[in-house]
A protein has these predicted regions:
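Interdomain "pre-motor" coupling segment immediately N-terminal to P-loop NTPase/helicase cores
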Residues: 19-70
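Short hinge/gating elements
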Residues: 8-11, 27-31, 76, 104, ...
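Charged, compositionally biased N-terminal leader segments and the immediate start
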Residues: 1-21
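Walker B motif beta-strand of ABC-family P-loop ATPases
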Residues: 166
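Extended interfacial segments that mediate partner engagement and assembly in macromolecular machines
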Residues: 54-109
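Conserved P-loop
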Residues: 85-163, 210-213
Length: 250
């Protein structure tokens, strides 16, 4: 191919936003010629490579937008250390069918039992399926909601949260909430209810959630929404982190 058509082709591919196509067309032409493949195979191969790369970039963007504190997969979780956790259910949830049904997940257990790891793993699985995910702690979310309310940007933040396929709220119960903070959190969970799915991790059993929200009425209404369509992951026992550290030293 002479220089002028090459320049024109690269220009067109750039305009069409086909970077993989642009980077691979010359190499794949040589390979297809060596393999005696026709132009249909050549174009099909380039299109497949473009789609694979496009999906990879999309997943990368989803993971970045989720704001995970760290990237952890379910494959790296040692279920043998936490026998109380239902592994078949957890792995089935990683298929993300529950998101299509707008169901919720609540992981309950003492501090250090791996709840955040499981939430991160489920969040990563959702990103890998092209779903929009947002991760936050309960304390950080309440802080953001109060700040947004003070700056008259509350509706914008609520809209961002309700547009997600999955919202993950970690560490509910670690910090008591103010009355206004509890009401704002209740409001955003109510808005997300049946629009998308919610994952909540908590170190407190349900009957102690009143300590967090400070109101039996608010707690009851919140649990009514969250547990309407819910999968409960029980994670009881000795600290997962302690067991995992001990196992690694052996």
């Amino acid at each position: 191919m002479t220089e002028a058509p090459q320049i024109l082709l690269r220009h067109h591919l750039k305009q069409l936003r086909l970077p993989t196509f642009q980077g691979e067309y010359a190499k794949q032409a040589q390979l297809c010629a060596a393999e005696n493949k026709d132009h249909i195979h050549y174009l099909a191969r380039l299109c497949e490579m473009e789609l694979i790369e496009r999906e990879r970039r999309m997943i990368e963007r989803r993971i970045k937008a989720a704001k995970f504190p760290s990237t952890k997969s379910l494959d790296s979780f040692d279920f043998k250390i936490m026998p109380s956790l239902n592994k078949p259910l957890t792995m089935d949830l990683a298929r993300c069918d529950y998101v299509d049904r707008r169901e919720n997940i609540i992981a309950l257990g003492p501090s250090g039992t791996g709840k955040t790891h499981i939430a991160l793993g489920l969040g990563l699985a959702a990103c890998q399926r092209g779903l929009k995910v947002r991760f936050t702690t309960a304390a950080a979310l309440v802080h953001d909601l109060i700040e947004a309310q003070d700056e008259r940007k509350l509706q914008r933040l609520q809209k961002q949260l309700t547009s997600q396929n999955l919202v993950i709220i970690d560490e509910l119960g670690f910090v008591p909430l103010s009355k206004s903070g509890a009401e704002l959190l209740f409001e955003v969970i109510s808005q997300c209810y049946e629009r998308g799915s919610i994952i909540i991790t908590s170190n407190l059993p349900f009957d102690e959630w009143t300590k967090v929200f400070g109101s039996e009425r608010l707690t009851g209404a919140l649990l009514d929404r969250l547990t309407h369509h819910v999968h409960i992951l029980e994670m009881n026992g000795e600290s997962y982190r302690l067991k995992h550290s001990r196992k690694n030293r052996q």
